[in-house]
């Protein structure tokens, strides 16, 4: 009897200590991530990790189960099955705690964080841009003259950032009312109260404004569910923080450029023409504002070049990424990349007065510095 109570008490104490350590470490990780990487990685990566959530849930369940089992036991009664189950959960908590220490140490490394953001970005790109690029440039409905809208639906309630739009429901409503609905902001935009949310063209009286507003999700911070540009934003912010004078870690910036290069290779082969959403009959029903190829290229290279051109490592890695993209992407994607290559040449000429540094900065290197300038098949 005494031994069972002592065992349950030890399990409760151990799981309480595990919980304190876990949440304390999470707070430290949040501070480190916000200070050395970017605050935007906290909500998208750290607080959404299912492994940390599951292990924390195991600790809480084990603590409550062991404490409740101790409360059920009378003075001369031992609930052997419950004590055995509590002991199993206690052992599982110990194993999970040891695993969590190793997992957290690997998870908080820069390469792991940027790789996870890259994986999330790939998933969002594949879900938003599902069709391959055709190479045919077509003027979207968004840029065609439609005249003044027949009705403007404005934002009501609280202001916020557009997180997602239920496009399927919008198309269904537009088809039933025989109208064209233009969603004015872009996913990721901040919308203030009384700011235009929808433009309606056609039989606008058949649509309820309040039901239309419920098809848009708002929040206080951007997410990646329907916003592939946000993955680029996070990676660029990590690179910029690494290039700041306070941190001065261009190698971490190179890791971020690796993932930007990877995302651009994927998005460059996709059709970005998703402004017009058609119904089953082929008629345009919903018009959205979406990023084009130039937007993705600009966010990937402009700021990093601006703040990192003085680093030979960054200049070489940017050049390697751009030249590789020109080689592997379709012809209609090359013009924006050639402009960035020209801007890199101008920037390094301004930042590197010595001919030797200038010549070195003009050599593409996928490692930044340390990679071979020319691949050879025979090395002696």
Name each model-derived stretch.
Residues 2-73, 94, 98-101, 239:
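Transmembrane alpha-helix detector for multi-pass membrane proteins
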Residues 77-83, 99-182, 186-187, 195-380:
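Short basic (Lys/Arg) and small-residue
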Residues 8-10, 78-90:
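Hydrophobic alpha-helical transmembrane segments
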Residues 64-65, 89-92, 377-379:
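N-terminal start-of-domain structural block
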